[in-house]
Structures are given as structure tokens and as C-alpha cells.
């Protein structure tokens, strides 16, 4: 059976502009070796949207970092070693001089404060940028749903039951010393996906939700080159990654959001962005096969969403 070409278990949550960030405490961490790591370490997956976002951010900042690739296709994030680092089982994870940070927007907020130059969050506008990034996080499950239906299209269950069993059983179960409900929400999503698949109705709703968000972004880009004005910011990074994923899914940006499409093409030409979303040949071939089958069945995203 064909393996999935890019499933991801990431979450872009964060509190940019607030002082509270998700840094784990020692009791949360069972894989104790990371407490001795020095420098900037990133646990990530090539095809994870939130990992891609963080890598672009690191590129633009010029921050040296050590890579630890976590193979989500092999469900390595559901194994005891990784769950001992992040009990939520999500990538990316930052370990900086032994301190473990989770949730990509929180990681970015931490790195922006720790490595302030060049600025990617406009000074004095942290709360505004944080509020806009919240829209990205609120759409996390919508992006995952459309990705699995129109990009990855796995032939079997979205997540194997034995992997979910390991996910439920391992890790501390706490974040910042408090029992954490996030894992239960993740398991509920995957169990429903395994049972019902990614239905037309759910995908249509997710696509329409994105359309409303991109309508708003298109209006912004009608009068300015970047999402927050004249300078590139973390908002551009975050929404570039979502735009890239949805473009792979067949979302008709040129038709519906021409300003977003032009902005996306401009950023996609920059190596700091392009190299982090480049697809290996086998993934490109799989996507072409998926698209061909969906076209023959009248099940392209544009058709399902009634765009």
C-alpha cells in the first residue's frame, strides 16, 4: 500500500503578544536527554505545515539550528521517545539550551524575543499580529481535513489504530504541570476520520471557511504588498504556508483571490520559502495521481466546495 505523502500532526497555536508561552516544565518531560541539549534544536517533519512555517522563520532570521526529523509517515510522533518530549505528540518542538517549547506560534514568539533581529513581528503591534495569527490556528483542523482529502488521500485509515493506542498510552499527559486536554481532542479527530472519512459536507464547510478568510486577506493585499503593510512579517510566513497547502489541494486562488495569488507567487520565488515547501518526486507523483482520480470522479476540491 502507498504510504501517505505528508500527513502532519502539528498545531500552530500560540500567544504572540502575551507573556504566557508554552514552555514545558520538567515533570512534563519523560525523555530526559533533551534537558542537556545545548543550542537551538528543532524537532520537525518535512511535510508538516507548522514545521514549514517555523523553518521559513528560522531562515529569515538567520538562526543556526540542529535538525531532528520526526517521520510522521511512520507515526514516530506517537512513540514513547517523542511523546516524552512533547506529550501532545505534535511538531514542531523547540529545545533551546534544554528548555522545551511547544506550539509553533509560541515558539516563534519566543524566538522573536530571544533573537530580535531582523524583526518579523512589528514592534508595538504584537497583540494585533497575535490576533491575526489566531485565525490561522482556528483553521488548523480545517486545513488538516482538506489536506487528507485532497492532497494525501491515504488508501487506509488516516491514522492506524495501533498508532493511536500508543499515542493515548504514552507521554506524561501534562503540559506545564497540568492535565492536558489537547491530546483527547486530537484522538477524537483521528478516530472520527478513521470511522467516517473526510466527508463532502465537512470539506465543503472547511473550504468555505477558508474562502471567507482569504477574501479578507485579498482586500488587505489590494492596497499593500504584505499582509501587515509594507514589510514582510510572520503573518506572511504563516499564511504563505496555508496558501501553499491549499494550492496543492486544488484551491482556485487565481480565480477567487487574485491579490493573494500574486502575493503567494512573489514569496514562492524566494529561496527561504521555496526550499521549505519543496516536494520530493514521489510526493509530486502521488499528488498527480490523486488529482487525476478526483477529476475523473468529479471530486476536485473546487467541485466539492461548489466554488
Regions picked out by a protein language model, each given a short descriptive name:
Residues 5-10:
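Short, low-complexity intrinsically disordered segments enriched in A/P/G/S/L with frequent Arg
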Residues 14, 37-38, 55, 64-68, ...:
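N-terminal start-of-chain detector that recognizes signal peptides
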Residues 14-183, 294, 304-307:
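GST-like domain detector, emphasizing the conserved glutathione-binding G-site
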Residues 22-26, 31-37, 41-44, 52, ...:
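C-terminal or late-domain output modules
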Residues 80, 84, 109, 113, ...:
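Charged/polar, solvent-exposed surface patches and flexible loops
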Residues 141-265:
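GST-like fold's C-terminal all-alpha helical module
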Amino acid at each position: 500500500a502507498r504510504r501517505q505523502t505528508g500527513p502532519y500532526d502539528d498545531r500552530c497555536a500560540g500567544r504572540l503578544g502575551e507573556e504566557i508561552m508554552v514552555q514545558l516544565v520538567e515533570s512534563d518531560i519523560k525523555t530526559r536527554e533533551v534537558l542537556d541539549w545545548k543550542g537551538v534544536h528543532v524537532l520537525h517533519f518535512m511535510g508538516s505545515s507548522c514545521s514549514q512555517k517555523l523553518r521559513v522563520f528560522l531562515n529569515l532570521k538567520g538562526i543556526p539550528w540542529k535538525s531532528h526529523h520526526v517521520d510522521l509517515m511512520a507515526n514516530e510522533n506517537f512513540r514513547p521517545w517523542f511523546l516524552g518530549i512533547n506529550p501532545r505528540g505534535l511538531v514542531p518542538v523547540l529545545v533551546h539550551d534544554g528548555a522545551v517549547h511547544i506550539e509553533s506560534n509560541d515558539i516563534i514568539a519566543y524566538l522573536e524575543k530571544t533573537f530580535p533581529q531582523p524583526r518579523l513581528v512589528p514592534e508595538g503591534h504584537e497583540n494585533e499580529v497575535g490576533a491575526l495569527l489566531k485565525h490561522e490556528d482556528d483553521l488548523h483542523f480545517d486545513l488538516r481535513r482538506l489536506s487528507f482529502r485532497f492532497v494525501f488521500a491515504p488508501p487506509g485509515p488516516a491514522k492506524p489504530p495501533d498508532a493511536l493506542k500508543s499515542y493515548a498510552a504514552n507521554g506524561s499527559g501534562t503540559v506545564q504541570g497540568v492535565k492536558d486536554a489537547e491530546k483527547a481532542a486530537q484522538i477524537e479527530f483521528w478516530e472520527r476520520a478513521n470511522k467516517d472519512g473526510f466527508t463532502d459536507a465537512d470539506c465543503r464547510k472547511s473550504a468555505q471557511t477558508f474562502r471567507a478568510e482569504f477574501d479578507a486577506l485579498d482586500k488587505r493585499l489590494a492596497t499593500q504588498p504584505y499582509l501587515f503593510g509594507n514589510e514582510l512579517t510572520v503573518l506572511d510566513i504563516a499564511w504563505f504556508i496555508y496558501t501553499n497547502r491549499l494550492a496543492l489541494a486544488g484551491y482556485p486562488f487565481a480565480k477567487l483571490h487574485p491579490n493573494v495569488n500574486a502575493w503567494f507567487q512573489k514569496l514562492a520565488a524566494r529561496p527561504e520559502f521555496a526550499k521549505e515547501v519543496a516536494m520530493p518526486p514521489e510526493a509530486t507523483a502521488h499528488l498527480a495521481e490523486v488529482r487525476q482520480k478526483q477529476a475523473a470522479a468529479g471530486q476536485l476540491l473546487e467541485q466539492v466546495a461548489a466554488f
